[in-house]
């Protein structure tokens, strides 16, 4: 057996040793065909091929399936473990050119540009108000919900049910079933059978027991877990039994039921990162971090190259369906959008949005920054296209991704009425507290 694995390793090393040499070749021919010592030193050592490693792993798996499981380590186990360790070590050394013993130079890390329009995409926890990175938000929200149990266990358990369980259909089914239990208790307060819930009941097991937070909810609203005898059965089973205090206040059960039905998952909100800049010639220059893209920068370049080649080949043959498919692919490429709005005084208002957010969210963002938020205004894209405050259209559908510069103007008819009355709109349209934090765009 040991010889078998030695042969596998020898075969792997033989395949990676490079081209062979004939014994009849002259020294001159060997020198011509071979590489110089300096070049050989620069060439990193080649590890076993993927096919060879897979073959060795498959052989090990077949052998392990055929051999009965021993009670203790055997000599064959030791051999297999040793071979596996050696193969893994060789694979690691071949896949890690920067490891000691190799001559490869490690690739330099990508430097973050100091001129990014925003440092990244951030979120705000609705429970704590803490600003979070995307990779921090889920863990932080879970911890915040768990911490809430000490102050309001009912609300915390409801949040846990709706947030920790991702399958929305399963959550709805479980919540509706819990609501039915509570309805029966409220409608039939004298019926003792409705005040006990059998934990091994099929409906409870399939719809409720699988939901994180469901047990905490029952205990928080007054149920206690007890073991009771079951009629016509020898053993005992666990039940949730409504406590005396909860029975005396049935209106609380009705309130908790409605809270459970009306609740939504706790989600971090996107931080708009509202910023105001002085007038700048760099207003249309956007350097975005990788967070703004669904694909990595390398994947975006590759997709652009492939798309260019496809367009050149099929420019005269593309159908309407192909064009629509291409447009949909383009829309899905971006996750976020950075929008700047140039105001009448030249200042710039900047905010971060989801690429699929509606135009109404953009208009609301601008309106909340104005001194006179009751005055109607217009937003126009760089090509002069007027944007409508539409609940149906999203930013990516209007070409405002991954970044856009818009122009703000007051509604012309309203502006004429103001001037006809002998008044003029304020030169600065933004709220004073925003102007106090104005920055220089760089």
UniProtKB/Swiss-Prot annotation:
Keyword Ion transport: no
Localization: Cytoplasm; Cytoplasm, Cytosol; Membrane; Nucleus
Biased composition (Polar residues): 90-105
Keywords assigned by UniProt, alphabetized: Cytoplasm, Cytoskeleton, Endosome, Lysosome, Membrane, Nucleus, Phosphoprotein, Ubl conjugation pathway
Domain UBX: 332-408
Region of interest (VCP/p97-interacting motif (VIM)), residue spans: 51-63
Signal peptide feature range: none
Region (Mediates interaction with LMAN1), start-end ranges: 1-10
The protein's role, per its UniProt record: May negatively regulate the ATPase activity of VCP, an ATP-driven segregase that associates with different cofactors to control a wide variety of cellular processes. As a cofactor of VCP, it may play a role in the transport of CAV1 to lysosomes for degradation. It may also play a role in endoplasmic reticulum-associated degradation (ERAD) of misfolded proteins. Together with VCP and other cofactors, it may play a role in macroautophagy, regulating for instance the clearance of damaged lysosomes.
Subunit structure: Interacts with VCP through the PUB domain (via C-terminus) and VIM motif (via N-terminus); the interaction is direct. Forms a ternary complex with CAV1 and VCP. Interacts with SYVN1. Interacts with HERPUD1. Interacts with VCPKMT. May interact with DERL1. Interacts with PLAA, VCP and YOD1; may form a complex involved in macroautophagy. Interacts with LMAN1.
Stated name of the protein: UBX domain-containing protein 6
Organism: Mus musculus
Gene: Ubxn6
